[in-house]
């Protein structure tokens, strides 16, 4: 997808990191940044390849995730070590979502029991 505003043009590529062979989709490409949506569901090889492809000076990474365990590799290496990686860590809870009613929040909480509660 190509987006132009004024004299600036950006090209966006969309890939999935669903399995171990996914890293090959982006191998060899030069990127100025990546947005990895639900990064905890992606394979580590895809994530590491995406980060390695960000070779333009000033490249940025954006992640969002809901790791299923405090032992998840992404949680261990990025969330817990965000300061060492010069990363901004922002945490949100269900209650932070202004579009969710209290009834919906309670329903979600009753459906999803996890170690995070």
Per-region residue spans from a language model:
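Short, flexible loop motifs at catalytic/binding sites
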Residues: 1-117
């Amino acid at each position: 997808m190509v987006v132009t505003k004024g004299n600036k043009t950006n090209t966006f590529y969309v890939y999935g990191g669903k399995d171990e062979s996914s890293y090959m989709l982006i191998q060899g490409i030069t990127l100025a940044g990546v947005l990895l949506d639900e990064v905890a569901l992606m394979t580590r090889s895809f994530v590491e390849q995406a980060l390695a492809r960000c070779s333009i000076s000033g490249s940025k990474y954006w992640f969002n995730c809901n790791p299923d365990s405090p032992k998840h590799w992404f949680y261990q290496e990025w969330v817990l070590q965000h300061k060492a990686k010069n990363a901004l860590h922002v945490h949100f809870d269900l209650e932070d979502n202004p579009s969710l009613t209290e009834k919906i929040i309670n329903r979600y909480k009753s459906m999803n029991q996890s170690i995070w509660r």
